[in-house]
């Protein structure tokens, strides 16, 4: 049987991995074995952190809303509950932007939330 080196396909596979490892330090960007390990780990982290990013932003928005609500003498849970009772359906991202960038509008919303809770 003739010896098969898998030339083109193997080279293409290795080059694909090394291309993904471009910019890594040291042997991780040059040696196929270490590059494979580094790329596999990086892809796992990327997948995990795409999910984590959504949770992180939600936490950030809630923190900002809570800070804005406390400046208006109402806590976060009563603020959100009051908005729900008043029928105002703004998501946390929009509310956080209002709390940071448009304080008068956020104050009006907190007044509405207080009235709905009363």
UniProtKB/Swiss-Prot annotation:
Annotated GO biological process: ribosomal large subunit assembly; translation
Functional note: Binds directly to 23S ribosomal RNA and is necessary for the in vitro assembly process of the 50S ribosomal subunit. It is not involved in the protein synthesizing functions of that subunit.
Family membership: Belongs to the bacterial ribosomal protein bL20 family.
Gene that this polypeptide is encoded by: rplT
InterPro entries: Ribosomal_bL20, RIBOSOMAL_L20_CS, Ribosomal_protein_bL20_C
Pfam families recorded: Ribosomal_L20 (PF00453)
This protein's name: Large ribosomal subunit protein bL20
Keyword tRNA-binding (UniProt): no
Any one GO MF annotation of this record: rRNA binding
NCBIfam families according to UniProt: rplT_bact (TIGR01032)
Species this protein is from: Desulfotalea psychrophila (strain LSv54 / DSM 12343)
